[in-house]
Amino acid sequence: MKHNNTITKAVAGALLALAATGTSAYAATNEELEKQLAVLQQTVEALKQQVQSQKVAVPENVATQDDVEGVRADLENFKYDESRQQERNTAKTFRDTTLFGAVQTRAQLQDHQDNAATLAGNGNPASNASNRSSTFDVPLALLGVRGNLYKDYVEGKNLDYQLSFTYGKRSDGTNNSDFNLADAFLRYNVLSTNGGLEASKLNVTFGQQLIPFGLEAQAPEELRPTINVANAPAFLGLFNRQVGVIVRGDVNPFVDYAANYRAPLVEYAFGVVNGNAQNKLDNNNSKDYLGRVALTLPVNYASWLRELKVGTSFYKGSANVKNAAGTAVLNNDGKSDRYGFDLYYNHAPYGATYEYFQGRTDVARANNTIGEAKGEGHTLTLFYTFGDQFFNSIKSVAKFDDWHPQSIQPFYRYDYYNPNKNAALPGFPKDTNAWTTQTLGVNWFFAQTTKLQIGLNHVNYDTETATKNDYNELQAQFQYGF
Amino acid sequence: MKKTLLSWFVALSAATTFLIQPITALAEDSPKEIRIGISSAGVGGKPKVGYSSVTTGHLRGVLEEEFKKDGIKVVWRLFPGAGPATNEAFSNGQVDFGWHGDLPAIVGRSTGLRHKVIFSAGRFGPFYVVVPADSKAKSLEDLKGQTISIFKGTALQLQLSRLLKRYNLKESDFRVISQDQFQSRTSLATGDIAAAITSPWTLEARGVAKRLIEIRDDKFLNAPLTFWVGEEFEKKYPHIVQRVTTALIKQAHWSSLEENRNEQYKLWAQSGVPYLDWKKDWDDYDLKERHSPLLDDHYVAAIKQGVVEAKEFKLIRKDVDVDSWIEPKYLNTALKELKLEGFWPELDAQGNRKDGKK
């Protein structure tokens, strides 16, 4: 624009000069006119050159039309590639979905080959099935999806879902396995989930799910701390998923903004379920009821008493009590109650958990009367963690590569279970079936979702028999998740 | 077989000891590594951040250069979880130094974290309240009853409280939710929140949001940033603290020079925040004022005011004694060694230059 003005002025000036000389044109000779024309031509040439030079002198940091076209072409190519890949190479779902899973691969060695399968209930293969002392095993393979069916951006009252399957070995002597439904539920958050740490939580879960009893029983498979699960909750059926509706929530959370630490003063859960475990209809006309309350000490994150939690749980169950022959139901509202108390302390690097379990189960005698078996168990776990794996800040630290903090966690577990402390009943002798498992182990978290667990178990029966001998067991297990 | 198990047990114990050994290796006269917590991360969780002379020091590797000859490793931990994550890491002995906004540092100190403030690491700067592009709001008043997003626990929480107080409003007049910076930008773009305190530039470039409020000259809305050292580390390695301070004050000098403004923007753009955005946020500011490391009257007054506000807004339960928290000796020594006394303008408690210049 600036040089256009200059040209206009220059040409106008030259024309005015020409016009001025034109007033005396009569007097001018042809020679003079030619001279004036030559001057005019020179002026035009000079102006042309000036314009040319000004065009070349466009500052380098100003984008040209070509530059803009180039960027646009790149952008269009990028958009095309994105939409093409989206269409051809991306798995799609209708709703927000996260695929997740966990797998365990295990090796174990026992020093007794003649024990009965009494401990098979805790997921540990019986030692004597083929007179073996060692085996490789895949105890867990779990695959699932989770996400939300409705996302409430304003208040965070989301409707979430989870669906997962686990494989189970068949016990019919074949090499086959089944893929069984594990979790199948939807969960509605009644209270806001985005109101900040100080907001209370409340959700309702409907469907098949783990039950909120104690500590270990409600932890998903991939988060359980030891290779073998605790004996008492395993034999009292507390690891079973149940079908029903359960409400979970907390009130009066204590918040330490220093570390965004949230410690709800009271956590609670209550619900009603079939009581007939997973993938089955109810087998009687009574529902089972459960509840849990836990209190966490309201202290700052920096306090030594942080994450100190005390909880108590109950499960009021009703079961069909069959006669000794198993041919008739004597009572379809038999007792199958469970009570628990737990203590949790986790102040890295130290950690401790303790759980007490009591089970009261109706059992038929040979004369078709019914007696109560009172089972009792204690599980104490102490651990110490070397490394940074369990700090939220370190886990989420900004990084370019697949770096993840490593942790090594030696632990000791004392695990006692007595199936019956009351008078003897068929299958439930008084006290003599009790045993203790002591485990010395180490968990090595060497990648973000992978750990190697090694455990040395010593199993000690209160009363040894020909098929129940004390034994030692060495286990090694990789567990990975994705 | 029992013998076999015994030998397995011995092997297990030996393996555990072997695995644990490198993690628990003890420090000697000098630390094997110096760990610095930065309460921020780049776009998408990149371990690169702009904004401060300290983070420029990270991008330029000034501490790595300083400690190369001693074989001391410098570990920078950049936390997307911002200030609260730095506090969590410090509580668990995972960082020795920290770069913090005012609120997380104050809250941390009030809950018993033992550290010493050794220099100021940035101050002032623009403040934006951003709303969706189609918002009809003309003022904060128009947003009453609607959702405002901030990252609670970070300095933004105090900034919002100060802003609301300025307009005679209260947090309870709105629904204030907690989202990190990236979540709040997404929510603004989808129109699911009414406003957020965030940088407007990338959102405006996409046409999805606009500025409702822009404040560029408030001396107390953005309180000074703080660089601190853990008391235990300071007691053990005072000579290392001095070297870290001196290297970073030298960096603050580099960052404050007008001739380095453009290069610094380019370095900061490695964080994923575009070069042009840095220009828009910084071009009209005096680099010396924004990068001043001084623990002057303005720094002290702003932090003391932050303590009072944090208490008023019920973000802390215990008081913080600011005077005993500040340890200026490392900064003073560095300024003397580097002959930088008087380089940065001292500000009075109101944020005005003591030399009278504007």
Which residue stretches match the model-derived regions?
Chain B
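Short, polar/charged alpha-helical segment
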Residues: P31, G42-V74, S110-T111, Q305
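A local structural motif
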Residues: P31-E33, E66-F79, Q94-D96, K165-S178, ...
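A bilobed periplasmic-binding-protein/Venus flytrap-type ligand-binding module shared by bacterial periplasmic
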Residues: I38-S40, F127-A137, A223-H239
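Secondary-structure end/capping motifs
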Residues: G42-G44, Y237-V320
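Short helix-initiation/N-cap motifs at beta->coil->alpha
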Residues: W76-E88, G101, S172-A189
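A ligand-binding cleft/hinge motif common to bilobed small-molecule-binding domains
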Residues: W99-T111, S161, T190-R211, A302, ...
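Pocket-lining segment of extracytoplasmic ligand-binding domains
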Residues: V176-I177, F182-G272
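Conserved C-terminal helix/tail region of periplasmic/extracytoplasmic solute-binding proteins
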Residues: K311-K358
